[in-house]
A protein has these predicted regions:
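C-terminal, beta-rich DNA-binding module of retroviral/retroelements integrases
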Residues: 125-233
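Short loop/turn microsegments at loop-to-beta-strand junctions
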Residues: 3-5, 199-200
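RNase H-like DDE/DDD metal-dependent nuclease/strand-transfer catalytic core used by mobile genetic elements
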Residues: 1-4, 10-118, 122-123, 214-218
């Protein structure tokens, strides 16, 4: 079954890409965003829905592997509330236009479908004026980001008051040699920082982004890990 993933600039409505594929994966999404970022620069934030590979309602802060890659690039992931696509209304309206033009019905194969998508992107950006843009086209209004895409992930140093811990292959951090706090397998091999708030409460970050709290006083069983909470526990 063919699906399409698009990315667009909220302010100018400029449509960066519309890529057809049979299955949405982290690898495919990362490759497509890399092309976009290399050409147009990186934004300060990205607003998405909660579908894979962008978000997961079961994960801490809804973050996925793709979310953590965005964070490493200095991009803040922002999510619509579950079942509320209207919170990203501009993108949803564009998606409806694209679907009407390219997917009713879809082309006979992915290559032919991509030709349709490419034609839509060109027309949407360069030909079709938008009332919200004073009847200008997105291409006329859009400006490139001043933040270039880094070919290597920038290093990050936690403040000296943080306890820096490597996430294990199963997504946990070892605590006081014997105990475990589960975070997410999406962070395996990466380093998180834990800030001591006193009275056994720790605040956990990945780079400069808050993940959650845990109370070390609640860790009693060496065989059972505890999980982060969004509230102080």
């Amino acid at each position: 079954m063919q699906t399409t993933k698009e990315s667009a600039d909220s302010k100018s409505r400029f449509l960066f890409t519309a890529k057809g594929h049979y299955r949405e994966t982290f690898k495919a999404a990362k490759a497509e965003f890399t092309k976009v970022f290399r050409k147009y620069g990186i934004p300060h934030q990205i607003h998405t829905d909660n579908g894979s590979p962008f978000g997961s309602v079961r994960a801490i802060q809804r973050f996925t592997r793709l979310s953590y890659w965005f964070i490493e690039l200095g991009i803040t992931p922002v999510f619509s509330d579950p079942a509320h696509p209207e919170q990203n209304g501009r993108h949803e309206r564009m998606h409806r236009d694209l679907k009407a033009a390219c997917a009713k019905p879809s082309a006979y194969d992915l290559k032919a479908q991509q030709r349709r998508l490419n034609h839509f992107v060109k027309e949407y950006n360069h030909v079709r004026p938008h009332e919200a843009l004073d009847m200008e086209t997105p291409a006329f209004v859009h400006s490139f980001s001043t933040r270039p895409f880094p070919e290597r992930i920038p290093s990050f140093d936690y403040s000296s008051n943080f306890k820096v811990i490597k996430v294990t292959q199963n997504g946990s951090i070892r605590w006081k040699s014997y105990y475990w706090v589960y975070l997410t397998a999406a962070l395996k091999g990466k380093y998180v920082g834990a800030e001591d708030l006193g009275k056994g409460i720790w605040k956990v970050f990945y780079r400069n982004v808050f993940l959650g709290f845990f109370n070390e006083n609640n860790i009693r069983d060496k065989q059972v890990s505890i999980r982060l909470s969004q509230n102080i526990v």
